[in-house]
Amino acid sequence: MTTITIALSKGRIFDETLPLLAAAGIVPKENPETSRKLIIETNQPNVRVVIVRATDVPTYVQYGAADLGVAGKDVLIEHGGEGLYAPLDLNIAKCRMMVAVPEGFDYENAVRQGNRLKVASKYTKTAREHFASKGVHIDLIKLYGSMELAPLAGLADAIVDLVSTGGTLKANKLVAVEDIMGISSRLVVNQASLKVKRETLQPIIDAFAQAVEK
């Protein structure tokens, strides 16, 4: 029996992937929010789910530790996508990648005057490419969380981060000033697995595709 391993991260992506898994006849036996297990069995004896950090999903799939995974476009851009086949935009976990600054900071004027800006982000590749395309000189500061704190603490002039409702920005007196791109999560597949296990993997991929189209 061919074993299939699916890499998912906790939280919104896991929750929004459940209906897609169900469409493929796959139901995890436990919820990662309440279980301490990192390998979760499913109702299909040959399918298991591994729970990893969102940023690690592409790596697990790339190196074959997982055959399939679900990862945000933001994560895939930073990863680079080597060794991955990304056949399907799942249209889940949607948000925007944006530039935000403190209220009262004249971002347009700073850019117009050619000021060198300090920008904090965990999406350093995306941030670097965005500002380079605009001809804006920046000092990039890589952070791993609490991005909104950076301008408040004087660490950065601006941040590049994911924005869903804008509530967190507003609560920290920040405003979005540029929309970089829309973000949603994609199905990613290990290229070698697709060749070796196509008979088992393709029906899962097809079921996901049909569920997304509905």
UniProtKB/Swiss-Prot annotation:
Q: Which residues form the signal peptide?
A: none
**Broad class of enzyme this protein falls into:** transferase
Keyword Amino-acid biosynthesis assigned to the entry: answer is yes
Note the CDD domains from the entry: PBP2_HisGs
Specify one Pfam family: HisG
- Protein location: Cytoplasm
Gene Ontology biological process: L-histidine biosynthetic process
Q: What EC number(s) would the UniProt record show?
A: 2.4.2.17
Do the record's keywords include Glycosyltransferase? yes
Name the chemical reaction catalysed here. 1-(5-phospho-beta-D-ribosyl)-ATP + diphosphate = 5-phospho-alpha-D-ribose 1-diphosphate + ATP
Mind listing the GO molecular function terms for this protein? ATP binding; ATP phosphoribosyltransferase activity
UniProtKB keywords: Amino-acid biosynthesis, ATP-binding, Cytoplasm, Glycosyltransferase, Histidine biosynthesis, Nucleotide-binding, Transferase
Pathway membership: Amino-acid biosynthesis; L-histidine biosynthesis; L-histidine from 5-phospho-alpha-D-ribose 1-diphosphate: step 1/9
The family annotation for this protein states: Belongs to the ATP phosphoribosyltransferase family. Short subfamily.
Q: Which PANTHER family match?
A: ATP PHOSPHORIBOSYLTRANSFERASE (PTHR21403:SF8), ATP PHOSPHORIBOSYLTRANSFERASE ATP-PRTASE (PTHR21403)
Q: What is this protein called?
A: ATP phosphoribosyltransferase
Q: Which organism is it from?
A: Dechloromonas aromatica (strain RCB)
Question: What lineage does UniProt assign to this protein's organism?
Answer: Bacteria, Pseudomonadati, Pseudomonadota, Betaproteobacteria, Rhodocyclales
Give the gene that encodes this protein.
Answer: hisG
